A protein has these predicted regions:
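Short alpha-helix-to-loop micro-motif enriched in aromatics/charged/Gly
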Residues: 58-64, 85, 89
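Acidic, proline/glycine-rich intrinsically disordered inter-domain spacer in sigma factors
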Residues: 99-113
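Arg/Lys-rich amphipathic alpha helix in sigma70-family domain 2
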Residues: 75-93
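Structural recognition of an alpha-helix C-terminal capping motif at a helix-to-coil junction
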Residues: 31, 45-52, 56, 64-76
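Acidic, Ser/Thr- and Pro/Gly-rich low-complexity regulatory segments
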Residues: 1-3
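Solvent-exposed, non-membrane alpha-helical residues enriched in polar/charged side chains
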Residues: 7-8, 19, 30, 34, ...
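Short loop-to-helix capping motifs
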Residues: 13-14, 39
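Amphipathic, Lys/Arg- and hydrophobic-enriched alpha-helical face
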Residues: 22-40
Length: 113
């Protein structure tokens, strides 16, 4: 099915539009998400979010190249998830180090004054 036919299905709000999009560009969308997000579950969620975003944006938008449009959405959503994941872990090294340090420092009651 050609891009303009799939876009017409989106304008009709036919659920078949998602099926056709998955059939034609699903592998490319999944590759984009998987290359950015190494975790398979995160990549799968990004792919699902991509389909939902495309569904919500068409209409009113009418992309000329549906594959590039969908992959760009997948890329942006994947990068957003990647940055959120890495931001959460940014100081986790210090948390672990402080926990280990806490175990090695003697309690105040055992220190001689």
């Amino acid at each position: 099915m050609k891009d303009h036919e799939i876009i017409a299905l989106f304008f009709e709000r036919s659920e078949r539009a998602i099926t056709e999009l998955m059939g034609k560009y699903g592998a490319a969308i999944k590759n984009v998400a998987s290359n950015i997000l190494k975790d398979a579950q995160d990549a799968e969620e990004a792919v699902s979010d991509t389909y939902l975003t495309v569904w919500n944006r068409i209409p009113p938008e009418e992309p000329k190249y549906l594959g590039a449009y969908s992959c760009r959405i997948a890329r942006n959503l994947s990068l957003k998830r990647f940055h959120a994941n890495t931001a959460q872990k940014r100081n986790s090294y210090y948390d672990v180090a402080l926990d280990e340090l806490e175990e090695t420092i003697p309690a105040l009651s055992t220190v001689l004054a």
